[in-house]
């Protein structure tokens, strides 16, 4: 009897259920972060190095080749130094570790809130599409010509539970305090702005995120594709200029002193990773892991998969690539892309980069953890397979030190998910709004 009443209520009130569940989970996160800080020992890894780098910077030394700490030189762009200079001042010159932990716990809570907001937009769109389809079927509309294009995702409200269950992710914030926490917070703010149609602000925050750590560049091919799909080539250029201008403005003090040193240090793509820290390639022999040919092979496969997925997405576009490139030049209004289409492309292209990364360290789990539930629910896996996938992934990232088995499990699971995503039908690219025939009439896309 209870089941007969509860299930229909949940089905008909998914948005209310989402907000209720999200509220409880936020309270849970506040409590769990407090417990972690109070009862789990802090682990020093990079915080002291960040502090030492900031101290050199605050002394007025702007030559990037001279900014370093115990574990090495500063290999992050200028935004990293600005952010950690602020944290340095907030934590009594970096000495108040407990205060720093609480700040990073607050950053975790804020990031979780933003991610919940992104998933909320996704869930609302899914419910709207399901309702519209049901209404169309009931009204017997003759939409046979559009049936092939009527593909959308069914994202359930309870998916956000899986965003709060990772031991590793909690430790990255409250116990490790890596700069990845800052860069991913800025990225998710950027992504939320983008799905709300605030592209200029989205590009600004995206570039700020890159200025803290370059891993966010893994999303850049997807961002470029979405910009072209929305605005066309000419109207995309100002958005790219925003991204570039942010990097230049933040780097001015360092570019004026030693521009070559800054560019080589802050954007060093040839940096060699240590085999002992790799999470994803432990099953390879060390000599192969360190081989430059292996790095070039991974880069080639990375680019190949990006091209294959873009071809898949372009086929969904009416008029193909030529229509995308023409849009800005023939004065067409911007298109309003669907939330789930934006998220699927951004998250999938990032997963490609993660899967074929030269090396993943433990904190790099944060690069894609919050995207996994969405990607898994974008496939036709059953619930048990989806949960099993997340358990395998969590196991691999919590195995320390990594083993041949754990790293092989991680690579295979990521690779299988990529293949599954490739063979899924491409979802609708446009939002199902009455005003979307000419872009947007009521709400401007900026």
Swiss-Prot record:
Compartments, as annotated in UniProt: Endoplasmic reticulum membrane
Enzyme's top EC category: transferase
Catalytic activity of the protein: an alpha-D-Man-(1->2)-alpha-D-Man-(1->2)-alpha-D-Man-(1->3)-[alpha-D-Man-(1->6)]-beta-D-Man-(1->4)-beta-D-GlcNAc-(1->4)-alpha-D-GlcNAc-diphospho-di-trans,poly-cis-dolichol + a di-trans,poly-cis-dolichyl beta-D-mannosyl phosphate = an alpha-D-Man-(1->2)-alpha-D-Man-(1->2)-alpha-D-Man-(1->3)-[alpha-D-Man-(1->3)-alpha-D-Man-(1->6)]-beta-D-Man-(1->4)-beta-D-GlcNAc-(1->4)-alpha-D-GlcNAc-diphospho-di-trans,poly-cis-dolichol + a di-trans,poly-cis-dolichyl phosphate + H(+)
Alphabetized Pfam families for the sequence: ALG3
EC number(s) recorded for this UniProt protein: 2.4.1.258
Chief place where the protein resides: endoplasmic reticulum
GO cellular component terms, A-Z: endoplasmic reticulum; endoplasmic reticulum membrane
InterPro entries: Glycosyltransferase_ALG3
Pathway(s) it belongs to: Protein modification; protein glycosylation
GO BP term, pick one: protein glycosylation
Record keywords, A-Z: Endoplasmic reticulum, Glycosyltransferase, Membrane, Transferase, Transmembrane, Transmembrane helix
GO-annotated molecular function: alpha-1,3-mannosyltransferase activity; dol-P-Man:Man(5)GlcNAc(2)-PP-Dol alpha-1,3-mannosyltransferase activity
Topology within the bilayer: Multi-pass membrane protein
Family: Belongs to the glycosyltransferase ALG3 family.
Reported function: Dol-P-Man:Man(5)GlcNAc(2)-PP-Dol alpha-1,3-mannosyltransferase that operates in the biosynthetic pathway of dolichol-linked oligosaccharides, the glycan precursors employed in protein asparagine (N)-glycosylation. The assembly of dolichol-linked oligosaccharides begins on the cytosolic side of the endoplasmic reticulum membrane and finishes in its lumen. The sequential addition of sugars to dolichol pyrophosphate produces dolichol-linked oligosaccharides containing fourteen sugars, including two GlcNAcs, nine mannoses and three glucoses.
Identification of the protein by name: Probable Dol-P-Man:Man(5)GlcNAc(2)-PP-Dol alpha-1,3-mannosyltransferase
Source organism of this protein record: Dictyostelium discoideum
């Amino acid at each position: 009897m209870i089941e007969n009443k509860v299930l229909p209520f949940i089905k008909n009130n998914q948005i209310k259920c989402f907000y209720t569940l999200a509220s409880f989970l936020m309270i849970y996160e506040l409590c769990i972060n407090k417990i972690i800080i109070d009862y789990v020992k802090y682990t020093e890894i990079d915080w002291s190095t960040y502090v030492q780098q900031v101290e050199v910077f605050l002394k007025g030394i702007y030559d990037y080749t001279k900014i370093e700490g115990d574990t090495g030189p500063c290999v992050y762009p200028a935004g990293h130094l600005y952010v950690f200079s602020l944290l340095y001042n907030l934590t009594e010159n970096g000495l108040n570790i407990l205060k720093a932990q609480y700040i990073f716990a607050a950053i975790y809570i804020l990031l979780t809130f933003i991610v919940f907001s992104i998933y909320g937009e996704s869930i609302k769109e899914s419910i709207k599409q399901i309702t519209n389809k049901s209404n169309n079927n009931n009204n017997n509309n003759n939409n046979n010509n559009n049936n092939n294009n009527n593909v959308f995702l069914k994202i359930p409200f309870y998916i956000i539970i899986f965003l709060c269950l990772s031991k590793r992710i909690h430790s990255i914030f409250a116990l490790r305090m890596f700069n990845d926490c800052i860069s991913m917070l800025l990225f998710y703010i950027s992504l939320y702005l983008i799905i709300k149609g605030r592209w200029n602000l989205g590009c600004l925050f995206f570039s700020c995120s890159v200025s803290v750590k370059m891993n966010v560049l893994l999303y850049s091919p997807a961002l470029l594709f979405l910009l072209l799909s929305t605005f066309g080539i000419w109207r995309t250029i100002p958005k790219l200029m925003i991204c570039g201008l942010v990097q230049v403005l933040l780097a001015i003090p360092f570019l004026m002193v030693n521009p070559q040193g800054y560019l080589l240090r802050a954007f060093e793509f040839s940096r060699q990773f240590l085999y002992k820290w790799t999470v994803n390639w432990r099953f390879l022999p060390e000599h192969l892991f360190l081989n430059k040919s292996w790095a070039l092979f991974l880069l080639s496969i990375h680019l190949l998969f990006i091209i294959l997925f873009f071809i898949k997405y372009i086929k969904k576009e009416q008029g193909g690539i030529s229509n995308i490139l023409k849009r800005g030049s023939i004065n067409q209004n911007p298109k309003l892309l669907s939330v789930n289409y934006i998220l699927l492309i951004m998250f999938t292209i990032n997963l490609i980069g993660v899967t074929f990364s030269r090396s993943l360290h433990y904190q790099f789990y944060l690069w894609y953890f919050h995207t996994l539930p969405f990607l898994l629910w974008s496939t036709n896996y059953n619930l048990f397979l989806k949960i099993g996938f997340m358990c395998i992934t969590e196991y691999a990232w919590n195995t320390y030190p990594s083993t041949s088995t754990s790293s092989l499990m991680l690579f295979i699971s990521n690779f299988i998910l990529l293949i599954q995503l490739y063979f899924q039908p491409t979802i609708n690219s446009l939002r199902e709004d009455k005003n979307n025939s000419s872009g947007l009439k009521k709400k401007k896309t900026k």
